[in-house]
Amino acid sequence: MDINLIKQYINSSLPNDKESLIQYYGQLKQILNALSDKEQQQLLNNNGKISEQQQLSIENNYKVIGSIEEKMKSIEHLFNNLDVSDSNNNNSTSPVFISLDNQNTVNNNNNNNNNNNNNNNNNNNNNNNSLAPTVILDNNDNKKTAEIILPDHHNNTPQQQPEQQVQQQQVQQQQQVQQQQQQPEQQQQHLTEEQIQKQQQSQASIQQAIANMGEKKRSSSRHSGPPEIPPEEIKFDVKTDLLGGGAYGKVYKATCRGKKVAVKVPKKQTLSESELKSFKNEVEIMKQIFHPNVVLCLGACTKPGKVMIVSELMQTDLEKLIHSSEVEPPPLYERMKMCLDAALGINWLHGICNIIHRDLKLANLMISKDKTVKIGDFGFSQVIKTGTTLSDQKGPKGTALYMAPEVMMKHEFNEKADVYSFGLILYEMATCEELFPEYSEIDPFYDAICNKKLRPPIPDSFPKSLKTLIQKCWDHDPNKRPSFNEVTQRMNEVLTDTAISGLDAAMFWKYNFIKPESESVPWNEFVYKLSSVVNLPTQVLSPLAQLFVSQSYEEEIGGVVTMERFDLMNKWFGNFFNSKYGPAILYEMIELLKKRWFHFDISRDISEKRLRGRPENTFLLRLSANDPIKTPFTISKTKGSKPTHKRVSREDVQINEIKQFPMGYKFTVPLDGNELVFGSITQMVEELHRIGNLSIPCPITEIKVPYLTD
């Protein structure tokens, strides 16, 4: 397990609703159990003898364990008080959480039961999976896929707790609540002042989260397995609400308890005992995961003929977005951001939940309304212990086009199979091309991937960081593939290379700011680094915040510079990192900010609204987004009572022209059939104003001019 990832999770802010907070608590409990088992196993393996490095690792883990226990106990205490208050009003008892001391006993018992039942589950799988694997070749007009499906595809099933044991836990927990209420002063005496302050801060944050949950309290009785939702509460029309479908079944847009949701309906509605276990296991796996890049499972219905999984409603998936014939795909940088979202979600599955997805593909990467990518469809997912492997004895499961060769060859595999799939996803997202269009049969495809080790050709135009990551991910040897923790780190470099086109600018960002979540940097930090590179004081550069700070982040203290905005500045104004021309370019930028006629990067439509009703030759200069390198500026002015627009082109100068053009560029503007050339934008505007082509600088306000159609 990734300790750094766990620390981030522990220090993350609490969910704002009760259901998510309960899931968060359950995730903490799983991490706690896994860490405790890991330390005990390490001591057993070494017969109690450990090295200094192992000792440091164990001490670090115990610190993390302590942090988890402290946060869990605070949540328990507050929820217990909430439940006791409700039970007094309702004459019922329904404790939410089981105390840690009692839970350890329960966990030990459950671990023994799970160990005893593992062999039984494996035997049941072998007995029930008598059907041969099915290969499905889906030859649609838009997409050609091959899926390999087995009826029973889960090895791990959660164990049910006996009712008597749950009742005993509830009694024990109530006793603990009473003791906590009766002896608060004694507990306080054993805490230092710093510990008391820390506990109060933790409880205050949790109280704030609980305050947002609403007055209506849901039933808090504990049960294992997915939450059962009555079928009559899931409402949708099979004709009008269809979102998509595949070999497994169909997905519909629905309403459940007033909330818009997605409902996955399997084709097979009458399930055998083993199939029902598999279905519940899929839901249970989804229920264990709480992460912004994983689709949230809300519950399920297991009633025969009404079998369904209910999850949060997403807008679309990456396959529809990338391969749509009606809409152009997003720019490369945005597509790579989507890949980073997916990598973060998978890293969480591997690092915290020990879950292998096993069916990663564009169709299973969902997109929310805010363009966040989330991992979905856990039909083939399996829980795997760290350092162990799995194997498909009766045939591989998943989608063949994205399937790792070791899985296809029925060899042992681990989480690196997901890494292989991600390599193909990364390639597909970068090229917007379908995978392996030349193959329609499984046998030649198997030979190409497994024996000949063929992979799609990577275009030379790709940034080196992207090419290298793709090649590492789809390496034939699983041991040479990176972990998803490494993938997420490398994706930050890929984002920089795809967001920032200039070599010097990209190197500046990588050297100074590349780190996890490094898509933006505070202005104060940015200008300090820029000052040290271009050898200009921060006081001189400070006005540039008006250009560099992204408008969507202005509300933050000092503002934020995003990679996209930084790249645009480098395209619009040129390479201000150049040792010869850089200072002149930066001073030109600062001078432009003083001019009333400079209107930043407003759109053509806004410029025309500002010019409406103005006198002849009223003008403004704006930055152009159409081609920011070749035609970075546009002059908009009134002519004959109508707005007109002229683009200003820019090109590099020759070595013998440097004295005439100190910024390293020359700017050209058409005028009366001729082309006028200037060494700077300010020089150009001053000359056009002198000869009468431009007159009054346009203010940033608009004049309300009535039209006949108004």
From Swiss-Prot:
It is found in: Membrane. ATP binds at residues 243-251, 264. Residues 597-707 form the SH2 domain. InterPro entries: Kinase-like_dom_sf (IPR011009), Prot_kinase_dom (IPR000719), Protein_kinase_ATP_BS (IPR017441), Ser-Thr/Tyr_kinase_cat_dom (IPR001245), Ser/Thr_kinase_AS (IPR008271), Ser/Thr_Kinases-Pseudokinases (IPR051681), SH2 (IPR000980), SH2_dom_sf (IPR036860). It catalyses: L-seryl-[protein] + ATP = O-phospho-L-seryl-[protein] + ADP + H(+); L-threonyl-[protein] + ATP = O-phospho-L-threonyl-[protein] + ADP + H(+). Residues 237-495 form the Protein kinase domain. PROSITE patterns: PROTEIN_KINASE_ATP, PROTEIN_KINASE_DOM, PROTEIN_KINASE_ST, SH2. It comes from the Eukaryota. GO terms for molecular function: ATP binding; protein serine kinase activity; protein serine/threonine kinase activity; protein tyrosine kinase activity. Residues 83-94, 107-129, 197-208 have a biased composition (Low complexity). One of its GO terms (biological process) is signal transduction. Its main location: membrane. Residues 83-136, 189-232 are annotated as: Disordered. One of its GO terms (cellular component) is membrane. It holds the Pfam family PK_Tyr_Ser-Thr. Keywords: ATP-binding, Kinase, Membrane, Nucleotide-binding, Serine/threonine-protein kinase, Transferase, Tyrosine-protein kinase. The active site is at residue 359. Its EC number is 2.7.11.1. PANTHER family: DUAL SPECIFICITY PROTEIN KINASE SHKE (PTHR44329:SF28), SERINE/THREONINE-PROTEIN KINASE TNNI3K-RELATED (PTHR44329). Belongs to the protein kinase superfamily. Ser/Thr protein kinase family. SH2 domain-containing protein kinase subfamily. Required for proper chemotaxis and phagocytosis; proper spatiotemporal control of F-actin levels in chemotaxing cells. Negative regulator of the PI3K (phosphatidylinositol 3 kinase) pathway. Predominantly phosphorylates serines and threonines and tyrosines at a lower level. This is Dual specificity protein kinase shkE. It comes from Dictyostelium discoideum.
